[in-house]
Swiss-Prot record:
Classification via HAMAP family: Ribosomal_uS13
Annotated PROSITE patterns: RIBOSOMAL_S13_1, RIBOSOMAL_S13_2
Protein name: Small ribosomal subunit protein uS13
Subunit structure: Part of the 30S ribosomal subunit. Forms a loose heterodimer with protein S19. Forms two bridges to the 50S subunit in the 70S ribosome.
Entry's Gene Ontology cellular component terms: cytosol; small ribosomal subunit
Length: 118
C-alpha cells in the first residue's frame, strides 16, 4: 500500500478513487491532481512507479488535507460559537443551522427522543 498524507492508499483501486480515501480530497480534486501530475486516472496504484507516487505526494502536499483540515473546520465552528452569532448558537444547541424545521424531523441532529417527565 502506498502512503500519501499519512494515509494508506488502497492498491487495487484506480488512482482517482484511491485518492478520495484522503480526507479533503474528493473526485474533482483527485482528477485535478491526476491532471497536474499527468498520471492516468484509470491507472491502479499498484501499477504506478515510486517516482509517480512521489509526484502524487508532492501535489497532495499543496492542499490542506487530513488533520490540518479537520482542525481548521473545528476552529471555524468554535469561532462561530465564541462569536455568539446565530449559527454558533445553533451549533452549541446541536440544532440544524440552515433553516430546516425542528418541530418534526431533525432527529439526526437532535439525537434520540428524550422521554417526557410528568
Amino acid at each position: 500500500m502506498a502512503r500519501i498524507a499519512g494515509i494508506n492508499i488502497p492498491d487495487q483501486k484506480h488512482t482517482v478513487i484511491a485518492l478520495t480515501a484522503i480526507y479533503g480530497i474528493g473526485r474533482t480534486r483527485a482528477q485535478a491532481i491526476c491532471a497536474a501530475t499527468s498520471i492516468a486516472e484509470d491507472a491502479k496504484i499498484k501499477e504506478l512507479s515510486e517516482a509517480q507516487i512521489d509526484t502524487l505526494r508532492e501535489e497532495v502536499a499543496n492542499y490542506i488535507v487530513e488533520g490540518d483540515l479537520r482542525r481548521e473546520v473545528s476552529m471555524n465552528i468554535k469561532r462561530l460559537m465564541d462569536l455568539g452569532c446565530y449559527r454558533g448558537l445553533r451549533h452549541r444547541r446541536s440544532l440544524p443551522l440552515r433553516g430546516q424545521r425542528t418541530k418534526t424531523n431533525a432527529r439526526t441532529r437532535k439525537g434520540p427522543r428524550k422521554p417526557i417527565r410528568k
